[in-house]
Amino acid sequence: MDFSILESGFLPSKISTTLSKEFDDIEYVGNNLPKILANNQIESEVLNLEPEKDISNLGIDELERAMLLYSYIGHAYIWGNLKTDKVIPKNISKTWFKISQKLGRPPILSYASYALNNWKLQDKNKPFDLENIRILQNFLGGMDEDWFIMIHVAIEYEAKEILSNLKHYFLDQNEDQSFLESALESIRKINSIMNRMPEKCDPFIYYNRVRPYIFGWKNNPATPQGVIYEEVDEYNGKPQLFRGETGAQSSIVPALDALLGITHSNDPLREYLDEMRLYMPIEHRNILNHLDEWSESKRRSVTNQDKSVKLTNEIIKEVHTFRNKHLEYARTYIHEQSLSNQNNSNVVGTGGTPFMKYLDKHLQETVPTND
């Protein structure tokens, strides 16, 4: 495995903030999306876009920028359009599909576009922290929407301290203890960041302004048959069912699960977690596959080291804390809000799952094994 790709963790080493002039019309819609949605103009704006774009000369960072724009605009069209038919016009469907094929994931808004490639530092000369992150793209805008994404970006940044040291952990047994000590410190910082979600993201605003736009078309009552991508020959005019954006598409927790030996029983939850990998960048998918293979033998090598076992269990407890906080937020940001709103499902999460049941099961399966 090429460990160098983990130097920045699962965050990309380079993020494009604009595309070439050929994409000016797409950039315009993206830049003005909050106003377009507020004025119910998304349909007319999309139908004015040029259907075919040449993406042959785009680098990976530019493809990710294009994927971000088309994904946001596509979701805005489906969820911010007064029309009831769920058809994505050829004006965006054809190029969106081509981009998705190049990147190796479905034409849908995924975590990679929503968070990983959707930020910049306001001041590059200042340290990375929440106050110095700026979000590149949003739907309706506002601090609550931005803060929700910023928290995820900050968590990804902190996780890079774990991921960038994996090479030493796997290749040098003498580094076991120092790696685990560093990982424990990082996961504690991640939990501190997670605790800051309520500071600037209000549950009511999240539920009513942020959440509705990130749903997918699979296991969604609003799109029972899926969504048609107009003139995408590979789909033969048939509706497609893709999962919506969800934190389960982040590679951090699956990587920690593999490293720590946290397993999930063979059931629909496990199948869902495996499916989420299809929405991750290919490189992340490959890393997780390597970790799944290597981690079992690596864990065997530390079972005779009392200090390492103790540190491993401390990290597992911190992952348990993380999942417990996630479950708490699911209650306050979604379940409790849904009690007064029948139009925004509390049963199915944005990824199309019975999220409360799944999150609780995650929590129950995250327990130390070598106390």
Regions of interest found by a model, annotated:
Residues 1-371:
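Surface-exposed peri-terminal alpha-helical interaction modules
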